[in-house]
From Swiss-Prot:
This is Auxin transporter-like protein 3. The keyword Metal-binding does not apply. Keywords: Amino-acid transport, Auxin signaling pathway, Cell membrane, Glycoprotein, Membrane, Symport, Transmembrane, Transmembrane helix, Transport. Glycans are attached at N509. GO terms for molecular function: amino acid transmembrane transporter activity; symporter activity. It is a multi-pass membrane protein. Disulfide bonds: none annotated. Residues 93-94, 173-187, 233-247, 303-329, 393, 462-547 are extracellular. Residues 1-74, 116-151, 209-211, 269-281, 351-371, 415-440 are cytoplasmic. Carrier protein involved in proton-driven auxin influx. May mediate the formation of auxin gradient from developing leaves (site of auxin biosynthesis) to tips. It comes from Oryza sativa subsp. japonica. It is found in: Cell membrane.
Length: 547
């Protein structure tokens, strides 16, 4: 297998060093005296040192690199919205859905890896060379099932990655507001859009070695900060845990978790960056296990501490008091979101490069310039729909459900539908899954469940919630869920009554009759969390914790 490809349009990462050493050898063969040999030796040592450093930080293709990439890409800004989902679902459902969708996501990532190996093996039997070409999911579908599957896969995958990048950009603006509210969130979106555009200079997933490692460390800190800070903070006065209060909120929260464990839209690109892609099969499952050690404690602790107050604060950091520890979590999450933006955008860069004919171009500058148009619609959409939290659920139900659950399951069943294809398969289903029969039963269940619960109920609930956000805040919202500025609050009449937070949906308890327990009245805006926070901060810049 040509698994040593760079995955980014570069033939061989060892090429420059080898060429230099070869030139030095020729120089020594033709003579030139001791001085020439001494200079050549010094040059060789410097080149070797640079090559080793570059390999350590820049060129990653091991199974460990793939694990870091999968784990880092899977849990970014969504970590901050999971407590919000717990408030919508309730503690028990939140925990169960995380475990269930984590297992489901690991299974479909395994299917994608098997289809990739099947496609690549067939192509390499025909002497196809992939050293200057990155294989992508839509090409796997094209090679195994034809152009109609390719078109469907390309449409869903690109749209999901587009909005996945939008979500990261929205998350950057939402987070930075907690340590610097001198600028509104829309202005921060402009700034971070320009910063994230620099990801055009990262050639491929092969070059994310140090970034994946650092990104996972940063998310680990943020997750445990939320968990520990929530426990130390304790439950706010009058805390209520009334979720689920409506069927709309319930399925909205469930689809956000579906989105959380649906980060394998970049699985094929990560596999292609590996030196031995055959080792990928269990990597996503191992990454999911680690991610669960971050998401379960942080989400459950935050929900325990703040309860229903999270319904009006889709970012968990909004309710935690400002401290240097929280500021550090915000900064680290910002850096990780920049990295995750690159993860989501890189496959889009590849598609665009192939469209304009520059995918095999050896010039990084030309490719970077060609990639810039991809960033512009992402920037624009982040300004139109700044709804941090609700947009996750909408993307999860409408795009993730098909991209990473339904299409891979159906593609696997259709690819191996004939006895001959099953007999010649590069990789057979594991025995613990029941062989071919068990694999087809599991895939049928995945398709039915995600189609009905994820896309059907989840799509209806998420769109209802999303439309409510648009009706409440409007498109191009300048500062989504921001508290009123102190100067504006001082101008309001003394007897004026503050409006209730508009981010909470009106009660849908009548809709939920017969599904949930007796309807619980919608909780008041719950001043207790904010009262607690305000009691610890006297400076007016420090007590603006609303999202």
């Amino acid at each position: 297998m040509a698994s040593g490809s760079s995955g980014g349009g570069y033939a061989d990462e060892k090429g420059p060093g080898a060429a230099t050493m070869q030139a030095l050898g020729l120089q020594q063969q033709h003579g030139g005296g001791g001085e020439v040999e001494e200079e050549s030796s010094e040059m060789g040592e410097k080149t070797a040192a640079r090559t080793r450093l570059s390999g350590l930080l820049w060129h990653g293709g091991s199974a460990y690199d793939a694990w870091f990439s999968c784990a880092s890409n899977q849990v970014a800004q969504v970590l901050l919205t999971l407590p919000y989902s717990f408030a919508q679902l309730g503690m028990a459902s939140g925990l169960l859905f995380q475990l269930f969708y984590g297992l489901l996501g690991s299974w479909t990532a395994y299917l994608i890896s098997i289809l990739y190996l099947e496609y690549r093996t067939r192509k390499e039997r025909d002497k196809v060379d992939f050293r200057n070409h990155v294989i992508q999911w839509f090409e796997v579908l094209d090679g195994l099932l034809g152009r109609h599957w390719r078109n469907v896969g390309l449409a869903f995958n690109c749209t999901f990655l587009l909005f996945g990048s939008v979500i990261q950009l929205i998350g950057c603006a939402s987070n930075i507001y907690y340590i610097n509210d001198h600028l509104d969130k829309r202005t921060w979106t402009y700034i971070f859009g320009a910063c994230c555009a620099t990801t055009v200079f990262i050639p491929s997933f092969h070059n994310y070695r140090i970034w994946s490692f650092l990104g996972l460390l940063m998310t680990t800190y943020t997750a445990w900060y939320i968990a520990v800070a929530s426990l130390i903070h304790g439950q706010v006065e009058g805390v209520a845990h009334s979720g689920p209060t409506s069927i709309v909120l319930y399925f909205t929260g469930a689809t956000n978790i579906l989105y959380t464990f649906g980060g394998h839209a970049v699985t094929v690109e990560i596999m292609h960056a590996m030196w031995r892609p055959q080792k990928f099969k269990a990597i996503y499952l191992l990454a999911t296990v680690y991610v669960l050690t971050l998401t379960l404690p942080s989400a459950s602790a935050a929900y325990w501490a703040f309860g229903d107050a999270l319904l009006t604060h889709s970012n968990a950091l909004a309710l935690l008091p400002r401290t240097p520890w929280r500021d550090a979590a915000v900064v680290l999450m910002l850096i990780h979101q920049f990295i995750t933006f690159g993860f989501a955008c890189t496959p889009l860069y590849f598609v665009w490069e192939k469209l304009v004919g520059l995918h095999g171009c050896p010039s990084l500058c030309k490719r970077a310039a060609a990639r810039l148009p991809v960033v512009l619609p992402i920037w624009f959409l982040a300004i139109i729909f700044p709804f941090f939290g609700p947009i996750n659920s909408a993307v999860g139900s409408l795009l993730v459900s098909f991209t990473v659950y339904i299409i891979p399951s159906l593609a696997y069943m259709v690819t191996f539908r004939s006895p001959q294809s099953r007999q010649n398969a590069v990789e057979r289903p594991p025995r613990f899954a029941g062989g071919w029969t068990g694999a087809y039963v599991i895939n049928s269940f995945v398709v039915a469940w995600v189609l009905v619960v994820g896309f059907g109920f989840g799509g209806w609930a998420s769109i209802t919630n999303f439309v409510h956000q648009v009706d409440t805040f409007g498109l191009f919202a300048k500062c989504y869920q921001c508290p009123p500025h102190p100067a504006a609050a001082a101008l309001s009449p003394p007897g004026a009554i503050a409006p209730a937070p508009a981010s909470m949906l009106p009660p849908f308890n009548s809709t939920a009759a017969g599904i949930f327990a007796a309807p619980v009245p919608s909780p008041a805006p719950a001043p207790a969390p904010m009262h607690f926070v305000l009691g610890h901060h006297h400076h007016h810049r420090h007590h603006r914790h609303g999202l």
